[in-house]
Amino acid sequence: MGINEIIMYIMMFFMLIAAVDRILSQFGGSARFLGKLGKSIEGSGGQFEEGFMAMGALGLAMVGMTALAPVLAHLLGPVIIPLYEMLGANPSMFAGTLLACDMGGFFLAKELAGGDVAAWMYSGLILGSMMGPTIVFSIPVALGIIEPTDRRWLALGVLAGIVTIPISCIAGGLVAMYSGVEINGQPVEFTFALILMNMIPVIIVAVLVALGLKFIPEKMINGFQIFAKFLVALITIGLAAAVIKFLLGWELIPGLDPIFMAPGDQPGEVMRAIEVIGSISCVLLGAYPMVLLLTRWFEKPLMRVGNLLKINNMAAGGMVATLANNIPMFGMMKQMDTRGKVINCAFSVSAAFALGDHLGFAAANMNAMIFPMIVGKLVGGVTVIGVAMLLVPKDENVPAPANNEAEAHS
């Protein structure tokens, strides 16, 4: 049994715990039947529900872009392919640079890879779980949640995170190379040359983004927000066209990928968008409860880590929450000290969703890449903490307001 299978078994163990809690909650709660053990698992049933209900949000983000992937590859290929080949990189790296793996990056990378499966995995699941999500999801979402005064710390944190993405990708690529990734029984050949050469365009983009965040942070962040709005519009067009094609047979956009199984698809080998989303939700049934319970059971050690980093408890809790989803962390930012805000924003660039949506996506689409993806994301998360700590102005590490601390513990 490989490490990827072990991870899946662990998540399914937590899924069963959460299922038991959800059942017992109908009859008075787990604590009533299981005592202290029941009290320690209470609430996991709610996370079980959250995991399955994520299907709707995932569908809105994924289906349209998945359907559009071959169309976009056809339109962008004449520009992207020669440009990336000139740099010595595979064109699929374009997809993971701008799109999250679960927002079309994985499928667009496949279309642009030209049959190079290793480059597709490298871009679609490793790079596409770090840089792409930051640009199209994390920054726009954060701007709608955080206080305007915290935008500066968001920019500083993202700056630190973007700079360390190449390190994260190389770490994930090396794990993939040495762990012997196989897909449908065929080995996927990751090489040093592939891992390093494909970082050239990523480093160029990372440097440009970092310079922009350093010298014109407001304009850069607003630019990401505008890009995200156009992306939502594009995804909606793709979704509407794909649904009309499925229900009425009208091909409004030629070349759309089917969103349900099509004639000739082999069950278990070809997964279309709707089936992928269902598979991700099944994984999240265990992933969300796992994060909740591990956070609860190991609260004291986690708080000690926060003390070592010299951040308050709310900031330490935000880092743990980020491993599943960074939206709760952004909501907690106003209750963090300045150092904690920068570290959390930096940490979320690589580490966000490592035990949540991205884990579910990798498990549903290419479970051989679960371990390399998680290692890459966590290496990035750890590495970026040091960079973020260097970037925080020592004279501006303002503690969170006292009333916010009180609210946090009430």
Question: Where do the protein language model's features map onto the residues?
Answer:
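Transmembrane alpha-helix boundary signature
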Residues: P70-L75, A109-D116, L174-Y178, W250
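Membrane-spanning helices that line or support transport/gating and their immediate boundary helices
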Residues: V71, L75-L83, L293-L308, G386, ...
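Alpha-helical membrane segments and immediately flanking helix-loop junctions
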Residues: L87-I167, N312-M366
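Signature of multi-pass transmembrane helix bundles
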Residues: M1-G64, S123-G128, I135-G286, A368-S410
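Intrinsically disordered, low-complexity segments enriched in Gly and acidic/Ser/Thr residues
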Residues: A287-Y288, P301-N307, M314-M319
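Interfacial/capping segments of alpha-helical transmembrane domains
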Residues: V71-N90, E251-F260
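Juxtamembrane "helix exit" motif at the C-terminal ends of alpha-helical transmembrane segments
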Residues: L68-G77, I170, K245, F353-A368, ...
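Short amphipathic alpha-helical coupling elements at transmembrane boundaries
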Residues: G43-A54, I81-M86, K229, K300-I311
